[in-house]
Amino acid sequence: TCKDSCGYEVKALNSDYFMDSTQIRFDNLFLKDSYSTVNARYLSFGYTKGRDINDYVNKIVMGADFFNTTLDFRTVGVYAPTLKDNRLQMLIDGEVIGPVRDLRSKDLRVRMGDSTDVRVGVAITGLPNIDSTYFNFTFKDVNTIMPEVAEIVSSFAPSFKRETFDKIVPDVRLNVQGIAYGTLSDVYSTGTITTRIGDIDYHAQTYPDLKGNGRDVSIEIGAENLDLGHITSSELLGKGTLSTAIN
């Protein structure tokens, strides 16, 4: 095992190692830290000349093809203290390429919980300063259920009450297409949710609360031809228009 000055600790590491004049490459990589497990078909660091290492963030082009990689947000919390108690876990598959300051993936698959399966395009700019890093996600195909959505949102915004969400959002399987962008402390998302009881347009944002002790969340929902009877468990209501907001 080894630990860096920030407290990140590697528990196990195994790989085939190669090096030539243009890259350093690890094939069949396995890495385990205190919370996460990384599996990658390859991890590479490309350069045009040796002294590029002096400007690692901008000039070293990284590449990695992850499979069955488990990311626990407590690992990220080593470098981003606001996430140090966040126990959300993601199972990641897909290829990521770029220098540290501009990482991108055209098609990344992320699974969370028992029912959430996400395919996204990702652009991450601004690392290694995690607090000011800008994230941009394009949701290509998202399949999930509302209880898991509420659980994910509450893991980033502890003041968000899942019970409030359950009162106005039906517990059904849904497909989401849309975008999300922002920093770890301020995220905005908009898109369309497709369900068997109707389609819902949403706008959502998490942001620091006024007291600076955590995050608040704001959600606006609008729908037409939504099965209000299903939501309210009432046979007296049929399809209708819904517009509501949660803060």
What name fits each language-model region?
Residues G121-V122, T206:
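Conserved two-metal-ion catalytic palm core of "right-hand" nucleic acid polymerases
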Residues T1-G113, I130-N247:
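Extended amphipathic, helix-rich lipid-handling scaffolds
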Residues T116-V118:
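Long, contiguous interaction/targeting segments characteristic
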